[in-house]
């Protein structure tokens, strides 16, 4: 999930600037993405309460995966801001629901180890997405393949989440009390 989100977040301003949008518009799209992200975190928390954290994580991951592929194709100013807002909600929802998912599915006795592993792979994913966006841009001269790569990484994440979900069987959600 982190590869998908980081590529979009890091490359939205240069991509929009390269496509002829003013720097103010490009920065405004990033600001919109981040500000709506605040609502995404709160929204994901509420959705976790309703359908469970792993399902919410999958839903938000699916949202960011479907939305990320559209960034290089949107031409209108309204479309850019709408896509930035929807993606911001989804990507922040991924982050919030992933935290809750780990806390719910991991036994407390191994929580520190689990969080170390999750954090390690999250940071690797963040770096990979940012780097690959630039690498693919340099290789192809455009952002279409970079954002397609982000969507492919989102699909891999969804496959992993689906396998994890079905491998757990029908378990009842566990309340985590701090």
Residue spans for each PLM region:
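Extracytoplasmic gate region of multi-pass secondary transporters
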Residues: 1-44, 129
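Helix-to-loop junctions at the C-terminal end of transmembrane segments
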Residues: 40-52, 137-138
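C-terminal ends and interior cores of transmembrane alpha-helices
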Residues: 63-75
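Paired small-residue
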Residues: 67, 78-86
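Intracellular juxtamembrane helix-capping segments at the cytosolic ends
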Residues: 93-106
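A late C-terminal transmembrane helix in Major Facilitator Superfamily
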Residues: 105-142, 150
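Symmetry-related core transmembrane helices of the 12-TM Major Facilitator Superfamily/SLC fold
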Residues: 145-164
């Amino acid at each position: 999930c982190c590869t998908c989100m980081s590529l979009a977040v890091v490359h939205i301003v240069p991509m929009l600037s390269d496509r002829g949008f003013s720097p103010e518009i490009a920065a405004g799209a990033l600001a919109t993405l981040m500000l709506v992200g605040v609502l995404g975190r709160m929204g994901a928390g509420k959705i976790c309460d309703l359908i469970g954290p792993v399902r919410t994580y999958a839903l938000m991951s699916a949202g960011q995966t479907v939305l990320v592929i559209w960034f290089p194709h949107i031409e209108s100013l309204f479309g850019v801001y709408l896509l930035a807002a929807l993606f911001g909600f989804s990507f922040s929802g991924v982050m919030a629901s992933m935290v809750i998912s780990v806390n719910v599915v991991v036994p407390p006795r191994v929580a520190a180890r689990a969080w170390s592993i999750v954090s390690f792979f999250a940071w690797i994913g963040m770096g990979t997405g940012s780097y690959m966006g630039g690498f693919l841009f340099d290789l192809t001269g455009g952002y279409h393949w970079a954002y397609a790569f982000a969507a492919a990484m989102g699909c891999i994440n969804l496959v992993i989440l689906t396998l994890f979900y079905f491998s757990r069987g029908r378990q009842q959600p566990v309340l985590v009390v701090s």
